[in-house]
């Protein structure tokens, strides 16, 4: 519940930090704000944001804490959809084993956006 989420954020000492939440639940974000987590904000999702976020994550070697067992399960089972006629994998992620991965993508979205800005700024032709 949103009440439990708010309490968990508070108990971990993150109530004053920026928290990025799934933007598909604006009412939940509003409720969590009312519960004192004022810096919660919706994730910005654009065209192909899932695919772009996954490709961004794939650039890095991830080190997963042993206690993060569910996240490890998701990473090990994350898969791509198959073309129904050919059976070949297509460049579309399946909508399974992805809740933790989605949260991870949201947490990195600002870093990814800032990196793109730096690349655009330094790649101008003068």
Where are these regions (language model features)?
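Mg2+-dependent endonuclease catalytic cores in nucleic-acid-processing enzymes, primarily RNase H-like
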Residues: 1-92, 114, 124
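Charge-patterned, long linear interaction tracts outside catalytic cores
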Residues: 94-126
């Amino acid at each position: 519940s949103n009440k439990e989420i708010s309490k968990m954020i508070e108990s971990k000492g993150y109530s004053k930090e920026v928290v990025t939440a799934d933007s598909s639940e604006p009412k939940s974000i509003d409720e969590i704000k009312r519960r004192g987590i004022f810096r919660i904000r919706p994730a910005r999702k654009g065209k192909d944001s899932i695919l772009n976020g996954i490709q961004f994550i794939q650039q890095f070697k991830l080190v997963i804490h042993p206690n993060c067992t569910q996240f490890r399960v998701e990473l090990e089972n994350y898969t791509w959809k198959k073309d129904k006629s050919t059976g070949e994998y297509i460049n579309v992620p399946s909508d399974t084993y992805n809740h933790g991965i989605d949260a991870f993508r949201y947490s990195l979205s600002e870093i990814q956006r800032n990196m793109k800005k730096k690349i655009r700024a330094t790649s101008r032709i003068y």
